[in-house]
Amino acid sequence: MKYNVAVIGYGYWGPKLSRNFSNSNNFEIKHVIDISTINLNKAKKNFPLCKISKNYKSIFNQKVDLVVISTTTISHYKICKFFLKYTNVLVEKPLCLTSKQVFELEELAKKNKKLLFVDYPFIFSGSVNYLSKIIKNNSFGKLNEIESFREQAPIRKDVNVIWDLGVHDISILNFLLGDYSNVVNIIKYKTKKLKKIDTAYINLIYKNNIKVLIKNSWISPIKIRLIKFKFENAIVYYDENDPLYKIKIYTLSKTNKSLFNIKIPEIDITEPLFRLVEYIEKSLNKKRNKIFENNFNLNITKTLEKISKW
């Protein structure tokens, strides 16, 4: 069975999502909506058979199994609410800017028996799923500390760096450690030219007293996507920028305590967005959205709200 997809927003992220859905044998891009004629022409070039429009309401009552929303964050709530009345929805992160809106959308999805997905791409990566296994299996003893560095990204006008980059860190951490975290300290910076916070240092504590430091910044000469996990018996580096060796495990040498042994495990390096597409297909088939149950979206938003209000 092929699922019909409508994509709303074909600017920066919409084409990436569209490409991954079109690469699947189980989805077909039927509609692309965007307010830009240039973007619509690009979509028509990539998907000649799709219908294009500048009005998202034009696809109401069309046979659409999944609506993909990749627009400005402030518009997510309104568009998502409109479509959850009759079909399933995938929204680019962050879902909304308030937990109240997220809760309302989650309840609407339940009421109408529709599935609501959010594009937190890294929780579908082979690297994060490998990390989940070693944490659950207690492979290297107790996990004590995590340091995450996520720097350099296109500067956004609709949200600040916490809601842009920090949402990745919080989604990964909540996926790995559970939803509860306590905000300890936040330092935020705003350059004179930018009206929004562009750099943030975030200190959190998760259950079992796991201490977390996050640095998010748009302002960086190099792109950094690095998370360090400090276990009792090892330090694990997760470098999303490394094309092949995304996970490196360092353990102290038994013969020389000033040296480390390094192990590089075999990791699935399939593009996370394609794994997201596979997950959505399975969820639609089973009519169950397992990862996003138990308030996963809501708890991420609540944490981001706490950080923003600090």
Describe the predicted segments one by one.
Residues V91-E92, L116-V118, Y238:
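Hydrophobic residues in well-ordered beta-strands that form the structural core
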Residues P121, K230-N295:
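C-terminal glycine/acidic-rich active-site capping loop/insertion
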Residues L17, F47, K51-L108:
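Beta-loop-alpha module in the N-terminal Rossmann-like domain of NAD(P)-dependent dehydrogenases
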Residues V167-L244, L276-R288:
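Contiguous beta-strand/loop segments that form the cofactor/metal-binding neighborhood of enzyme cores
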Residues L66-I69, K207, E278-W310:
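C-terminal helix-rich "cap/oligomerization" subdomain common to oxidoreductases
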Residues I74, C96-P154:
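A contiguous active-site-proximal alpha/beta segment in oxidoreductase catalytic domains
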Residues D119-G126, Q152-V183, L276, F296:
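Mid-domain beta-loop-alpha active-site segment that forms a flexible
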